[in-house]
Structures are given as C-alpha cells and as structure tokens.
Amino acid sequence: MNAADISRAPPGYLEVAWIADTCKLLMGLGWTTNYAGMIYKSLKDRTYGMALMPLCCNFAWELTYAVIYPFGSRQDKFTHYFGLMLNCGVMYTAVKNAEREWTHAPLVRRNLPFIFIICIAAWTTAHLALALQIGPSHAQAFSAYGCQLLLSVGALCQLLSRGSSRGASYFLWFCRFFGSLVLIPQDVLRYRYWRQDHEYMGSPLYIWFVSIFLLLDGSYALCLWYVRRFESEQEEAKKAKSI
C-alpha cells in the first residue's frame, strides 16, 4: 500500500508498473465492493459486519489518509475519498445496530456512543503519530498492514463469539480477502524491480504479516462454513420438532 514516487522508479520497474497499477485497481474494487456489501448486509440483518475495534481503526485510517494526509496520484486520492465515504455508511450501520449485539453486556451497551468516539479518536492519533514518526508514505503502508491483521482477527473472533453468520457472507469474505491478497503481487514486483525503496518487503516481519493474514482469512472461510452448517442443523432440528 506504499504510495511510492513513481518518478524515482528504475527502468526495470516501469516495464511492469502496469501490473502493479492493475493490482492496486483490483484492491480498490475489492474493498469498495466489500464496504458496499457490508452496508447492505448490515441493514438487512440489523447488525454490523465488522468488529468494533477494527472498524474504528479502519475508519481512522481512511480519515487520516483521505483528509489529513491526502497525497499520491489522483487515483490514490479518489480511492481514499471514496473509501472514506463508504466507511461512513459502514460506521452508520454499526452505530445504529450495535445495541442489538450487546444485550449481554449492559455496561457496554449503554456507553456504545462514547466507545465509538474514544476508539476513533485513539486510532486517529495512533495513525498520526506513526505518520509523524516515519513519514506519511511509509506510515500509510505499515498502518494498513496493522489494520488488516486487526480486521482479520476481529472478524474471526466476532464470528466465533456470535456463533452465527448474521452480518457475514462468503461474498463479503471473498471481496475483502481478494482486495488484500491482490496487493501481494504488487509488493513482489516492487521488491524485485525497485528494491532500493522497498527493501522491507523482503523482511521477516513482512513475510510474517503475509503468512498470518493468509492463515487468519483462510481460517475465517472454514469457520464460516462450519457456523453455517451448524445453523442449518439447528434449523432442521426445529422443523423436526414442530412436525
């Protein structure tokens, strides 16, 4: 997700830059579709699709790099602006429906508006602090990796704790998984042909991130299948009792 200055790119990278640009375009398409799908699914199921902490972190990231540190190509800026707009819709459905998911925790339920505000403010300051520490260009990439892992963990934990597929679907999973997965070929191209500015993409930490991302999101698909099978068995058992 690093917004590298293409004017510094070596000739070898320029020959394959169109592939990297296509990957970024597909990333935007995948995540845009995911956001729109989450809004629809949340309104339909009267719940929220993204766990609260990752949602606030992701919203703060979009806010930081669409409004506070807008930079990059026109395509990058449009992607951030549009992503922020859709994230506002995702946030709206979460605020609207969160109370229904927290009946088991009255203290949390009564203070959900404050929790949203505090979490968004805290994550925004975290993104800003990282941008001031290492520069917006690298901070955008590193914090995006962090957002992705938090989202993957949050989605898996939310699915298992609910024991229900409400707010979730294979389509939503595939859109976000594909939207993040397609950036890996882009990073490989940058590391291979533009290593001077992308040395960290061959680091143990980056390899660990990719491995954990694949493990978590792959596990999510399996868990969603298991939860849906359990729901189907429960429904069949209810029908059998009513006969």
From Swiss-Prot:
Entry-linked InterPro entries: PaxB-like (IPR039020)
Naturally occurring in which organism (per UniProt): Metarhizium anisopliae
Family: Belongs to the paxB family.
GN (gene name): dpmaB
This protein's name: Terpene cyclase dpmaB
Membrane topology summary: Multi-pass membrane protein
Biotechnology: Diterpenoid pyrones display various biological activities and subglutinol A shows insecticidal and anti-HIV activities.
TM stretches of this protein: 11-31, 51-71, 112-132, 141-161, 169-189, 207-227
Biological function: Terpene cyclase; part of the gene cluster that mediates the biosynthesis of the diterpenoid pyrones subglutinols A and B. The first step of the pathway is the synthesis of the alpha-pyrone moiety by the polyketide synthase dpmaA via condensation of one acetyl-CoA starter unit with 3 malonyl-CoA units and 2 methylations. The alpha-pyrone is then combined with geranylgeranyl pyrophosphate (GGPP) formed by the GGPP synthase dpmaD through the action of the prenyltransferase dpmaC to yield a linear alpha-pyrone diterpenoid.
Gene Ontology biological process terms, A to Z: terpenoid biosynthetic process
Origin organism lineage: Eukaryota, Fungi, Dikarya, Ascomycota, Pezizomycotina
GO MF annotation list: lyase activity
Pathway: Secondary metabolite biosynthesis; terpenoid biosynthesis
